[in-house]
Amino acid sequence: MYTHQKNSITAGVPVAEAKKAVIFIHGRGSSAEDILSLNNHLGIKDAAFFAPQATNNSWYPYSFMAPVKENQPALDSALGLIKELVAEIENAGILQDQIYFVGFSQGACLTLEYITRNAGKYGGAVAFTGGLIGKEINMQNYKGNFKQTPVLITTGDPDPHVPVSRVETSKGILEKMNAMVSLKIYPGKLHTISKQEILLAKEIVFDSNQLR
């Protein structure tokens, strides 16, 4: 088992000068560099970009549908790393409602798990193929009010790693916590991020907030 060390790469506007911040969370077997390249396609202006790097290129060792204890201590370490990064961004002067999250696959699961455990008014979140973590959902972990934070969740049907049923359950939980969730299911989509998903993320989460 393993934990994570603080190791993020950055791009975009320096955080001290930025109006917003975007945290990109990579998938299993990928890297911070890979996920950070999405910023070139999302067209986000006046933003500081952050991408933390997981130990062993994996935020937790087993499936997100495994019992939570089997993914410890890596999972708690990953959640703590994201929380520390958010605190640093806020300390630099960026308000919570100008902080955004983008994750793919394992990173999408971690994105949803983090924001739902720490619900508040964020700028927005995009989960490309992901759902809340655990063999069973523990509602005691989830507290707060999203205050209409826009959240986009996408997935393929079927997806080899992420059951559509868990994606739909996750959507319902976030909505009960007052998130404004958009879910898009693509029949037969490969386990990748498509051009259509990027355009949808721009439309639902980023373009509508450029003038805020």
Which residues fall in each region the model found?
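Serine-hydrolase catalytic machinery in alpha/beta-hydrolase-like enzymes
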Residues: 2-96
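Active-site nucleophile loop of the alpha/beta-hydrolase fold
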Residues: 52-55, 126-134
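Conserved hydrolase catalytic core segment
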Residues: 113-124
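Short alpha-helix in the alpha/beta-hydrolase fold that links the catalytic acid
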Residues: 35-38, 139, 163-173
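C-terminal catalytic histidine-bearing segment of alpha/beta-hydrolase fold enzymes
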Residues: 168-212
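Short beta-strand/loop motif that positions the catalytic acidic residue
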Residues: 152-155, 159
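Gly/Ala-rich beta-loop-alpha elbow adjacent to hydrolase catalytic centers
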Residues: 102-107, 111
